[in-house]
Amino acid sequence: MSVSRRVIHHGLYFAVLGPLIGVLFLVLYIFFAKEPLILLVIIQVLPLFILLSITTGAIPAMLTGVMVACLPEKIGSQKRYRCLVGGIGGVVITEIYCAVIVHIKDMASSALFENILSGENLVVRIIPALLAGVVMSRIITHLPGLDISCPETDSLS
């Protein structure tokens, strides 16, 4: 598989599945760390919650996928290092993206965006980005569309 095809597949899969994995872990975090009754409120607004996570997390997730696709073969061929780089890259890219959005006041005009992007809710951004980066880096070679018989993707699994 060519590098450009791998970049496109990784970027799209990360952009589509990454925010959803982040939402799953965030809901579990809220359920176990806060009161379980708050989960009922989240379930009521789950479609808005998912939409918000996709609008704020798709671009950083796509950039993380592109970064993972461009890893050198020595790092990308080992699952442990690929997951480590994917997790750290997810956090760093998400924080840079959120910092850019905060400085562009037009995009962060709503109170909901300002609340999520503020420094007080760092855990709400870091934990989902870290876990989504790790999980997606782990499962990316098993998703459809990637030619598993190709030596370039065999070295990544």
From Swiss-Prot:
Sequence ranges on the Periplasmic membrane side: 33-36, 105-125
Main location, first listed in the record: membrane
Ranges facing Cytoplasmic side: 1-11, 58-83, 147-157
Location in or out of the cell: Cell inner membrane
GO cellular component, one term: plasma membrane
Membrane disposition: Multi-pass membrane protein
UniProt keyword annotations, A-Z: Cell inner membrane, Cell membrane, Membrane, Transmembrane, Transmembrane helix
Listed transmembrane segments: 12-32, 37-57, 84-104, 126-146
Family as reported in the entry's similarity comment: Belongs to the CbrB family.
Protein name: Inner membrane protein CbrB
Species this chain originates from: Escherichia coli O6:H1 (strain CFT073 / ATCC 700928 / UPEC)
